[in-house]
């Protein structure tokens, strides 16, 4: 059956669900899981069903040697389980031989597998909400190297996971590794535009005043979507790399070359999946500023800022960047949330739609492509 993206409390329970819906949060994903849970509880109460929470308490305690185990603290027999994991949350720590050790994506993925094992054979069905796809940046083989994301997906399929829900995958074609498993890649385009207009209500999307620029060839699809729904023009950069050297695990970028029309006097919107160190984004923004761009808005679904915020503070102070738009789909350092130039987008309601749809075996097509909502958002401004 199909479902409108605007879920009413009545439609929430008017169809029989697959099984009782329950949420499990891996360590480090408590914030997003809690926000998803609030939407589900609110919808349930509006439909006359009293439910304090859908979250099952769990833990992944560590032994002093660093070994761990997954522990689920309530019965899950016959339940439709949704496990939320944030592989990018480096702020979670554990003791290892009396040293404070920060969790890596590998540690988070191991915890996910532990919790899947803890419910295996008892839950009716297990789905995984992994906003930032584990190993997603290692999605293809160029030389003799591992294919981490593909192997991880196959491992989850072998463990009995039925559905994977991710957001803005670095390359969604990685789902080819598990063609028989349900894999949904959602783009928070509507949520970003809504927050953008809340931040700047007077922002004009007229093609004479606004343009979209892709920071590289890999980000073209997401930027093409923005330019198509906004009705503005699209430019792009491509990276010239030195393939004779490897620095920090990648071939260093020699230069960014721009392809597109003039950006002079325009507001430029740059969308990418990740801001890691941010060097590429800042170099692209500086290049566009030199070409006469009036304002530059950077958007990244996963604002990691692995090298800190100082360079971005300076870029904003120097007038190179106007602001940066990110989401709460991964951990954000507390300092980032205090910056005036940062816009934090809440995507938890969008994720809650997926939980509801899958729990009722409803179509998620209208959720994945929110074109109607974007059209209404833009129409209401006129």
Task: Label each residue range with its predicted role.
Residues 1-382:
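PRPP-associated nucleotide enzymes
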């Amino acid at each position: 059956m199909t479902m409108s993206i605007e879920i009413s409390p009545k439609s929430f329970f008017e169809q029989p669900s697959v099984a009782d819906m329950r949420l499990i949060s891996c360590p480090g994903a408590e914030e997003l899981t809690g926000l998803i849970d609030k939407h589900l509880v609110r919808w349930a109460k509006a439909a006359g069903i009293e439910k304090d929470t859908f979250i099952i308490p769990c833990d992944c305690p560590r032994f002093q040697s660093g070994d761990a185990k997954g522990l689920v603290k309530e019965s899950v027999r016959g339940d439709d389980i949704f496990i939320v994991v944030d592989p990018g949350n480096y702020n979670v720590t554990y003791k290892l031989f009396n040293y404070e050790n920060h969790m890596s994506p590998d540690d988070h993925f191991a915890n996910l597998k532990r919790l899947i094992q803890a419910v295996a054979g008892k839950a009716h069905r297990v789905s995984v909400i992994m906003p930032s796809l584990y190993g997603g940046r290692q999605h293809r083989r160029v030389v003799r190297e591992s294919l981490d994301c593909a192997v991880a997906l196959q491992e989850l399929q072998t463990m009995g996971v039925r559905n994977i829900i991710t957001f803005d995958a670095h390359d969604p074609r990685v789902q080819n590794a598990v063609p028989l498993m349900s894999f949904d890649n959602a783009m928070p385009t509507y949520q970003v535009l809504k927050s953008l207009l809340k931040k700047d209500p007077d922002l004009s999307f007229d093609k004479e005043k606004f343009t979209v620029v892709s920071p590289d060839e890999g980000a073209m699809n997401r930027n093409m979507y923005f330019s198509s729904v906004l009705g503005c023009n699209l430019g792009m950069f491509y990276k010239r790399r030195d393939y004779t050297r490897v620095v920090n695990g990648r071939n260093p970028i020699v230069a960014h070359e721009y392809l597109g029309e003039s950006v002079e006097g325009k507001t430029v919107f740059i969308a990418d999946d990740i801001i890691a160190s941010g060097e590429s984004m800042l170099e692209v923004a500086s290049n566009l500023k030199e070409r006469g761009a009036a304002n530059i808005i950077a958007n990244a679904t996963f604002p990691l800022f692995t090298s800190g915020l100082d360079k971005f503070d300076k870029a904003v102070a120097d007038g190179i960047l106007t602001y940066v738009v990110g989401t709460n789909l991964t951990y954000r350092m507390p300092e980032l949330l205090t910056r005036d130039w940062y816009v934090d987008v809440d995507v938890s309601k969008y994720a809650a739609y997926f939980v509801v749809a899958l729990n009722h075996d409803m179509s998620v097509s209208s959720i994945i492509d929110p074109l109607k909502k974007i059209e209404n958002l833009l129409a209401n401004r006129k």
